[in-house]
Amino acid sequence: MVGAQLGLETVVSAIFDGSGDYAKTDHEAKFQIHRTFEGLLQQLLSLKWTEPSLIVIHGHYLDSLGLYLRHYPDVVASVVNKLFELLTSLPITIQGPSNNSRQARLQICSSFIRISRAADKALLPHMKNIADTMAYLQGEGRLLRAEHDHLCEAFLIMASSSGNRKSWPGYLNLLTKHGPKWNGKLHTCLTHLA
């Protein structure tokens, strides 16, 4: 399954990498490509795996479609919701002999980072919902510090993709509920981005 995921990532990159070839593709071919990837995405969204190692692979398949999401932002909300569903389906394990769930949870948070980089501006309209979900999970004690930090890093990548420095304070305000430690980090990061 891992080999197929790498193959998918290669195909998605070859088609949607921004080289301009896809933009020049005729409408009918674009429609067929979109339908193919949309069908694949629907299959991925409908999966209900519960084993941590399979959830990691599931997350990798979803983040392989990041460049596709850049061109078809109407499906971004479904992917974001699925990633949060995968994250919360795994138990929080702070200590114990098995840290498979903890590693899988971190990998799902890393998928947010990879999708943020690849999907570019497609995630901007979803930032408030992402921040609200992060705050909710944090408030419920269902988000570990390392997971929170990964998600905040993804959030910063999303904010920087806007390219509009004037909008960064608004993005910063979305995360102010995440505590003074992150507020300082966000101010520092946004200053460096400016």
Please give the residue ranges for each predicted region.
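Karyopherin-beta/Importin-beta family HEAT-repeat alpha-solenoid scaffold
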Residues: 1-194
